[in-house]
Amino acid sequence: MPYFPDIERIRYEGPASDSPLAFRHYDADKIILGKPMREHLRMAACYWHTFVWPGSDVFGAGTFKRPWQHAGDPMELAIGKAQAAFEFFSKLGIDYYCFHDTDVAPEGNSLKEYRNHFAQMIDHLERHQEESGIKLLWGTANCFSNPRFAAGAASNPDPEVFACAAAQVFSAMNATQRLKGANYVLWGGREGYETLLNTDLKREREQLGRFMRMVVEHKYKIGFKGDLLIEPKPQEPTKHQYDYDSATVFGFLQQFGLEKEIKVNIEANHATLAGHSFHHEVATAVSLGIFGSIDANRGDPQNGWDTDQFPNSVEEMTLVTYEILKAGGFGNGGFNFDSKVRRQSLDETDLFHGHVGAMDVLALSLERAAAMVQNDQLQRLKDQRYAGWQQPFGQSVLAGDFNLQSLAEHAFANELNPQAVSGRQEMLENVVNRFIYR
């Protein structure tokens, strides 16, 4: 049976359209900088917020009455949920989706039940993918919701919990491989601490390092060609999480020799919780060579928690997309909408409104960012700002031709007295705004 009988396939109608369910800017096959818009953006809808979350929060029960969420046999409901999901993906016209293992299959009462349920649902997902042409951007394992993970998964003080996490990640990686997923994500939802009074930081870090090495080894064992991605987040649900931000993740990867093996999946709302801009986190990951993929959403500036709202700022997303284009675009990654409608958005149609608006925001941001790249006044001004480092003296310093003493003697001997030069921040902000608000 159809779950969205009143919704037709969403189509591009152009900026002048008054239809609430039409794309004004997302023209999937429009060529931007030599390739279609859909290939630049690689947009995905997430399973968990869209089809699993019941509209609950810490103060109240779920407000949604989705037809795929009513009481019944767990496996039958999972099968129906998959049908609803792929009907939604197809009508939305989105090319990818993402899931946690327990989003798509009931966990059951034992690891054996979990394995059997998950295996059955992978059969269904594979069939849906073949019939629809929709692809898996990434899969992952939910190693944070089950009470056994209250003190973490890989960082847990109990090695048997560590082993249970390994069982889920093993299963989810194999499923991602079978479904031809482009990436595998590792989000350490409870890899952190509530208090240092009962926490051995060194031990937990070593446990995490060992777990990640096992994941990398398994990637090669099964021949997975996609990227492994850690998703940084500073806190929530724990007080402090070990994958705080992109720079912290890079330091962790370097410690365990994994900086060439694992990249990051950056979420906008996680960046702001860490006290950074989304732009900062993407630029940092690019500069460190670990940029992988994006969870596109936004937080509320007045709230200090993860609100996971749909992205709606062309200004913010243009700067982020500019950084991605300058870095050569996505490899295996893409823009996954880790976003959810509000608890009062009760109609199934609201799911479409949220995604359509967000897809248009990314499309318009891509066009604005592409224009910035083609003009690239920002890059020319950066080149001027750092021009001294391209001169013989600057090159000699970077090449190690000076030590601290000889460089100091050079400064004294030549009576160096360089003058500060304007950073032109206001002018640069005006340049960006001319592209965004043209």
UniProtKB/Swiss-Prot annotation:
Annotated positions binding Mg(2+) 1: 231, 267, 295, 338
GO cellular component: cytoplasm
Top EC class, one word: isomerase
Main location: cytoplasm
Cofactor(s) named in the record: Mg(2+)
Species whose genome carries this gene: Pseudomonas fluorescens (strain Pf0-1)
GO molecular function, one term: xylose isomerase activity
Family note: Belongs to the xylose isomerase family.
The EC number(s) this enzyme carries: 5.3.1.5
A biological process term (GO) from this entry: D-xylose metabolic process
Subunit architecture: Homotetramer.
The protein's name in its UniProt record: Xylose isomerase
Matches recorded under PANTHER family: PTHR48408, XYLOSE ISOMERASE
Binding site for Mg(2+) 2: 267, 270, 306, 308
Catalytic activity, reaction form: alpha-D-xylose = alpha-D-xylulofuranose
Keyword annotations from UniProtKB, A to Z: Carbohydrate metabolism, Cytoplasm, Isomerase, Magnesium, Metal-binding, Xylose metabolism
Subcellular localization: Cytoplasm
Cofactor comment: Binds 2 magnesium ions per subunit.
Record keyword Metal-binding present: yes
Active site (catalytic residues): 100, 103
